[in-house]
């Protein structure tokens, strides 16, 4: 059971509870009592549980000692299945078991340097709900209203807009890709403009300006390579780390 938390640039910070499952439906009484509003509510939820989608994947995991921290690296491969179709799972997850969050970003940066990976902004659950027809489809999002927001809040919104449209570009048809690219560039612009107005410009700002230009000038094949390139992924990680560690 994953509870509500905070997501910043691909870093999910939230309480999570695990229990063995012997069939298709979980036994909610196997989870801690304190996570429920009441046991009566828990039992009512149990009686109404219906499977909406399934995730079927093989997980390999390793415990890594890195920069004074213990980090679990999990590699999941499989698929998500819902009434609207299937989607591939092929992802790496890093979970901080002990130590400082800075180590988590450090290890992620090492993985990004290898190339061929990107930060995923959509969880398995979000993708599953879409395949079940219960979630909002991926679509172009307008530039949010930023009136009254401080610089860090604007950078957070800009990064979310950028990553949302990056995912859309990778999944949508050719006719929507230009709109998705414009959404990415709007997100980048929002991040850059907010960063420029801070009292002290972040160290990642020059790299962002370079990536903005490359994204704007890239053809379709070049853009796909850029989105999985070490430089762009490392930049997103640097922004996410700045938001998380400096907040």
Please name every model-derived segment.
Residues 1-247:
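Function-determining surface determinants
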């Amino acid at each position: 059971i994953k509870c509500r938390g905070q997501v910043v640039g691909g870093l999910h910070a939230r309480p999570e509870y695990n229990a063995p499952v012997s069939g298709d439906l979980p036994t909610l009484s196997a989870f801690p009592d304190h996570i429920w509003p009441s046991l009566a509510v828990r039992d009512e939820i149990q009686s109404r549980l219906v499977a909406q989608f399934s995730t079927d994947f093989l997980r390999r995991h390793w415990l890594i000692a890195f920069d004074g921290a213990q980090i679990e690296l999990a590699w999941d491969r499989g698929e998500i299945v819902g009434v609207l179709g299937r989607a591939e799972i092929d992802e790496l997850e890093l979970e901080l078991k002990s130590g400082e969050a800075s180590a988590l970003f450090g290890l992620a940066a090492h993985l990004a340097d290898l190339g061929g990976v990107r930060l995923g902004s959509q969880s398995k659950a979000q993708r599953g709900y879409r395949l079940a027809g219960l979630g909002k489809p991926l679509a172009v999002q307008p530039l949010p209203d930023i009136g009254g927001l401080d610089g860090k809040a604007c950078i957070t919104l800009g990064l979310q807009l950028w990553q949302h449209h990056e995912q859309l570009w990778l999944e949508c048809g050719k006719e929507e890709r230009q709109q998705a690219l414009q959404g990415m560039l709007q997100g980048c612009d929002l991040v850059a403009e907010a960063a420029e107005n801070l009292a002290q410009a972040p160290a990642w700002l020059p790299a962002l300006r370079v990536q903005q230009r490359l994204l704007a000038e890239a053809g379709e094949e070049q853009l796909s390579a850029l989105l999985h390139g070490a430089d762009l992924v490392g930049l997103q990680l640097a922004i996410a780390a700045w938001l998380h560690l400096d907040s």
